[in-house]
Regions:
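N-terminal prepro-regions of secreted/extracellular proteins
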Residues: 1-26
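Peptidoglycan cell-wall recognition and remodeling modules
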Residues: 25-122
Length: 122
């Protein structure tokens, strides 16, 4: 049953209303599905709002001024290495870091999103 829920989460990772857009790469779609499955729909929506504004879910998004990198714009990006050696380019590894970060710093993705809305960063 958990496997079916995970497959459905991956399929519907693009939004609560429908399947992933065709432009999404399978790896990004998997990262979104992983996040949704791990966090649940409500917390995923908050994480999605942050990731969309920070990087548009682009795992190679890089801020040349600050050095922030990836889906969640980790600063420094090397923070993500403890979640996998492929942290520079793998959105799943980046989402694992991002979910751990928002939980450790804000308690939840929705608390992080509320902070982002007030400050324009998290």
């Amino acid at each position: 049953m958990k496997a079916l829920a995970f497959v459905l989460a991956v399929f519907f990772a693009g939004s609560a209303a429908g399947p992933v857009e065709a432009a999404s790469t399978p790896t990004v779609a998997y990262a979104k599905g992983y996040a949704r499955y791990t966090l649940g729909a409500t917390q995923y929506a908050c994480l999605d709002a942050i990731a969309t504004r920070e990087s548009h879910w682009n795992p190679l998004s890089h801020n040349r001024t600050s050095g922030a990198h990836g889906v969640g714009q980790a600063l420094p990006w090397t923070k993500m290495r403890r979640f996998g050696p492929d942290a520079w380019h793998n959105p799943v590894t980046q989402v694992k870091w991002m979910t751990a970060y928002v939980h450790a710093r804000y308690g939840s993705a929705c608390n992080a999103w509320a902070f982002w809305q007030q400050h324009g960063w998290y």
